[in-house]
Amino acid sequence: LYSVIAHDLRSPMGSIKMVLNMLILNLPAEKIGDEMYELLTMANQTTEDVFSLLDNLLKWTKSQIGKLNVVYQDIDVVEVVDGVIDIFNMVAGLKKITIREEKPEKLAVSADIDMLKTVVRNLISNAIKFSNENSEVLVKLEEKDGTAVVSVQDHGCGIDEEGQKKLLHTDTHFSTFGTNNEEGSGLGLLLCQDFVVKNGGKLWFTSKKGEGSIFSFSLPLKK
């Protein structure tokens, strides 16, 4: 049922998202005024959040009922992360957030590229959501102990100890709000953990309330 609802709602929401993205790109505040631009930005952010939630819900449900299989292929993690960052630069710019990247020339793994993109998208989206304005999100890629490690660090609200205990557990509900009151359901992180484990890796995090969080995952390097 969840997958049917998410699928039926995702397409029209995607169309609305595309229109709002085009309006923001072509209608700067100087043209329509600060108040109207702020309303447009809020509508765009809300639509992005709803679309992301529907997309995560659809993938999570399919994964749980065994309808998502891992399709292994040779992937350069650096190339995948670069592509996701390009997509999120505009979203980050709306909060005056800079995405900085530290990376080697190449990190080769054998994994499902769609699942990998979903994980990176969710982690970067969350980092932007929970970062303060005029701050930086650091995306670090490195080779460590035979694995490719990707870490996404924000300088935002962080998670308290009680919240950390609930995160990444399907039997506990954890939701919170971003620095601009963007809603977070916790579903995206559960999906990230599921996809990383399915590809033979692991996901972990460190966080401190009021200072920010670092979410990391590893995948075995291509042999």
Model-derived features: where do they sit?
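Primarily the dimerization/phosphotransfer
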Residues: 1-25
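Short alpha-helical segment of the dimerization/phosphotransfer core of two-component systems
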Residues: 42-50
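Conserved micro-motifs of the catalytic ATP-binding
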Residues: 65-70, 108-111
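A conserved beta-strand-to-alpha-helix junction within the catalytic ATP-binding
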Residues: 71-86, 117
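Short conserved segment of the HATPase_c
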Residues: 159-173
